[in-house]
Amino acid sequence: MLSSTKTFYEEHCLYLPYMSGWFFFSSLLSGYNKVVFGNSYMAFPCPLLLTSIHFLVQWMFSFIMTRTWSDFGGDTVQSMSWKAFFLVSVPCGFVAAGDIGLSNLALVRITITFYTMVKASTPIFVVISASLFRIETITTSLLIVVLIISAGEFLTVMGEVNFDLIGFVLCICASIFSGMRWTIIQLKLQTLEPPLKTALATMRVLSPTMFFLMLIMSLVWEKPWSAFNGTAYFDTVLHSFQTMGLALAGATIAICMILCELHLIIKSSAFIMMIGGVVKEMCTVSMGYGRKKIMLLFHLVLPFYFFVYF
């Protein structure tokens, strides 16, 4: 009996704990980003700068954990040559920073509903990138499945009227990076010798590039030295501590989400991530269901098409 239960778990539920964690923390982080960055809410003036702080905290956390406890894979990271480190960190960090940074900028201008609708195109870009890198072969049945998934997710948020062109362009670019992100990270990690066996070791390798790229984007695009003029975020010592606390709260959520995501990337495939990503977006939409009845978080109304999708 125990053997059959274990076999069933290994065949059908192996990724369930990490998938569940990914769904939960990703939805929570989307809500955090919308509330902190959205023009209708706190309207934090430098989303990229705050995101770079999240990456810096991830780097520090993963470094301390892997250096303190060797079971987390710190020895593997320390034994990497600089060439091997950069060959993994730079391309993976670039696509990850592009996905996350552009998504956060899009959320400044668009609703969670519209964001989810555009992000429904991500499975298509996963298939394209997986084919380009020869990880998977595109078949007719696979294309049909991907199109059905994308169409079904689109139906869940059809009816959005708050269209914003810049937000749309940012979000579609984020979807392209997202499709490349899972494929490139999986490709780099699976071909690395010796492999990075833990999510913390992987975070330690990827987060430095993500931090520096996001910081550069912030300095060029947002110009933080002038963006905070006239705001209350750093006008007093108390407000400065509150702002840093806000950043640390987001970083904590991001660490939990990325650890789950990296574990799935290491142990599964890009297409399992694709399916999980669709469910993740549905969880994000579901968190906002019933603006007047259940939750007020994202100001969404879950349409009838949600049920058509399932």
Task: Put a short name on every predicted segment.
Residues 1-310:
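Polytopic endomembrane small-metabolite transporters, centered on the Drug/Metabolite Transporter
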